[in-house]
């Protein structure tokens, strides 16, 4: 049923990554799908962190890739050989949708949290992905 699954995670809140990660891993195993794991750094954060780091954005991206790899190992999912992706952009949901298109994802898995007041006014990234994705979206709540 699914051939390419994109898991989008927020490494600023690693505790919220657990359920979406386990859901994506289970689905990838069940369907023999390719798993892509993505984190998006907001453009403002990327610029500020790159200026603070002596080696810039590449060092930050490498650190994030290592953190994703550690999460994958803890979920006992290394056998899936997931494609780890780190991108940056002004719009997190637009980055997720763009990567989903590029990867040919037929399922996007995202986490969701208890909405804050600003989320009621602006909408969460998960809600925007659900609204605009061209493929199925699974929202895993913690």
Regions found by a protein language model. Give the residues of each.
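Short, hinge-like loop/turn segments at secondary-structure boundaries
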Residues: 53-56, 101-103, 126-128
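Short secondary-structure boundary segments
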Residues: 39, 111-113, 141-142
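Small/aliphatic-rich secondary-structure junction motif
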Residues: 2-51
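General small-molecule cofactor/ligand-binding pocket signal
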Residues: 36-38, 83-87, 138
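Conserved acidic residues
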Residues: 3, 106, 134
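Structural beta-alpha unit
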Residues: 74-108, 115
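A short acidic, glycine-rich active-site loop
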Residues: 54-66
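Glycine-rich, Arg-bearing micro-motifs that act as flexible, cationic patches
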Residues: 107-128, 132
């Amino acid at each position: 049923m699914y051939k390419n699954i994109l898991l989008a995670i927020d490494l600023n809140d690693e505790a919220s990554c657990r359920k979406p990660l386990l859901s994506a891993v289970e689905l990838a195993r069940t369907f023999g799908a390719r798993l892509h794991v993505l984190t998006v750094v907001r453009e403002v954060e990327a610029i500020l962190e790159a200026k603070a780091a002596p080696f810039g954005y590449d060092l930050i991206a490498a650190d994030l890739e290592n953190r994703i790899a550690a999460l994958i190992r803890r979920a006992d999912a290394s056998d899936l050989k997931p494609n780890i992706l780190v991108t940056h952009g002004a719009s997190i949901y637009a980055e997720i949708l763009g990567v989903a298109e590029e990867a040919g994802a037929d399922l996007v898995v995202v986490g969701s949290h208890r909405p804050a007041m600003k989320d009621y006014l602006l909408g969460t990234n998960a809600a925007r992905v659900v609204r605009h994705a061209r493929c199925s979206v699974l929202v895993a709540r913690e």
